[in-house]
Amino acid sequence: HRAIGLPMDSTYSAQHKMNLLEPLGVESSDLDLEMESSEEDQDYAEKLLKSVGSQAGKLQVSVSPVSRQPYKVWPAQHFAKLSDWLIESQGAQLYFLYGPGEEHFIESVKKEMNNDPMPDVGIPDLLQTRALLGKMDIHLGNDNGLRHLAIAAGIPTLGIFGKPSAVSWTPPGPTQHRSVEYDPGCKQSCTYPECEHLSCIRDVPVDEVHQALKNLLNDHIL
């Protein structure tokens, strides 16, 4: 038996776990998240979108401003600003996605918006949500499970990060998955839950996220 040293630099989480297996002779360079959806789930997603007024040719955007961890919740007013921009400037049809007990996050954003998003699509099950995300053109959201599903669905994503390292949770390589984070100087010595200001997420500049969103759209959609 021998101890395996753990790399201390920031590494994509999946790569980090694969690195632990290398001393055992297990190697892999395939880090792609894969989650197939059935024809039944695809039909469900298509009918759901049709029922709420989805229009072919319109930019389809999923937005997930939710998280059960306070250090992952970007302010509602910032999501509202970008949501309004997507609707007004890009003609987007915007869908808020959330899980059980997270409706209040959505309502907080809607109250700050000047435009109406698409009607609520409810809370589909996991595979139905994966199929729904596959119908989207792009995903914007906090660092949460829905972003991982969007990545598995193969659509471009933009994640907003607080306490966790963006490098650890954003697939390396292809530029269709991007992230924005802010370090107020204490991310490496975080004292959460003693931390009260949570500036690592609350102070992520909305202008930087806006620019990153524009770049992602220009590079992969428009």
How would you describe each model-predicted region?
Residues 1-222:
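Catalytic machinery of carbohydrate-active enzymes
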